[in-house]
Amino acid sequence: MNEFQRGGNKHRSWQQCFLYPLFFQEDLYAIAHDYHLDRSSSSEPAENCISNAFSFLTVKRSISRIRQQNESIVLFWNCDRNQWIDRNRSSSSELILEGLVVVLEISFSMRLKHSLEVMNGWKSFRSTHCLFPLMEEKFPHSNYILDIRVPYSIHPEILVRAFRRWIRDAPSLHLLRRILYECQNSSNAENLQKAILVVLRENTKFYLFLWNSYVYECESILVPLLKRSSHSRXXXXXXXXXXXXXXXXXXXXXXXXXXXXXKKIWLLKDPFIPYVRYGERSLIAXKGTHLQVKKCRYHLLNFWQCYFHLWFQPYRVCILELSKNCSSFLGFFLSVKMKSLMVRTKMVDDLLITYIITNEFDAIAPIRSIIGLLAKERFCDISGRPISKLAWTSLSDDDILDRFDRIWRNLFHYYSGSINQDGLYCIKYILLLSCAKTLACKHKTTIRVVREELGSKLFTKSFSKEREFISSFFSKTRSQRERIWHLDILRIIPLANSWQKIQNKKK
């Protein structure tokens, strides 16, 4: 990758984003083949056997055939006809498609690096770990939240229009258009005949690239808009102060000056706008009246529709009042609590007492929903009564203990900062008894016998006492109200992810 980028910096066509000659480089398809082997080695053996059918001789013949035919635009189309994006497509077409994505990713990464250098004034943290400090964030200037869900069914021409901004050669655009229309024809969605689901198959590299480039286009217009609005509000505040001073001189002239100054002020009055995104969900915290937030939502929808030339459904942008509504995000219920801080100001003759009111997030773990998902996985019934995991009775005792320990460790680490810790211990009790019942069912004995035979091994190896250790360590220096987040989480856990999908379907 680095060699291609260093070589591309010297080449003029690469600087102008002429990508079509790079599609004929055999080394790129070798990179895609190695990536596919690394990915399939950690998955099912069947995928590894299918990848052995890939032949570089087919790629070389296709390259030479297309070089001889100047009128040909579709690359490698004769390798596997009508099997580009099919569910039963061969490994050759899949790997060739991933080779095309390698070329696009190199150019996209260079464009992303350039855009980050331009937007260096915007303080952005592109990591999963920055999402958890959001739960501890205070919003003294915000009273509403815009809950935005990015649409994932779009027309292929919209993606081509987005690619046209950074790909300048017509053959590459025609090739991408042909592939995208094949994706559209292969989708079986009846109500989306003219759209393409960019997250239809998240496990393929091509759809991941489509989703990342599409989200980048969405944020490339949203983030500068928020940044520009914050600067414009700072300048407009001085104009509003000048209009207020003119109000003492002439009331009629002040009304006209205030109306002119109000046009410069943005709809929302918040000088600091928190923005966070994970997947298709985005949250924007803002300050203002309900009418101002509705106008902001209206203009945001119109701006998005004019930019992408697509119908942005209004229900995808919800307005939530922080003091009344709870929002589900990242597998948590987010409720806002108003906290007042008393400030005493001592003067010469008097003592002034004022109260500063701030809004704080309270992250609540959805205990009932987690119990329902555990019941779906056969760890308990719908009422929360633990049952044995019959599918694991053929495993060894250490494997059973390790699996239950891994489930509890992931749940505990992910929801360690939630305020309802008692509910987590209910989940621990369910998993602990389910583990004991699974071992008892395997050895055809009772739970009491299992606890007597394993003894402390059941409770130390599985479900370790790390919470008590951490709490005792921090209690010496911090208050008990402080919450502890474990930042060894690289992604949202599957239980929280599945629960979040259920919540999205309800909206």
Curated annotation (Swiss-Prot):
It comes from the Eukaryota. Pfam families: Intron_maturas2, MatK_N. One of its GO terms (biological process) is RNA splicing. InterPro entries: Domain_X, Maturase_MatK, Maturase_MatK_N. It is found in: Plastid, Chloroplast. GO terms for cellular component: chloroplast. Keywords: Chloroplast, mRNA processing, Plastid, RNA-binding, tRNA processing. The keyword Metal-binding does not apply. Belongs to the intron maturase 2 family. MatK subfamily. This is Maturase K. It comes from Araucaria heterophylla (Norfolk Island pine).
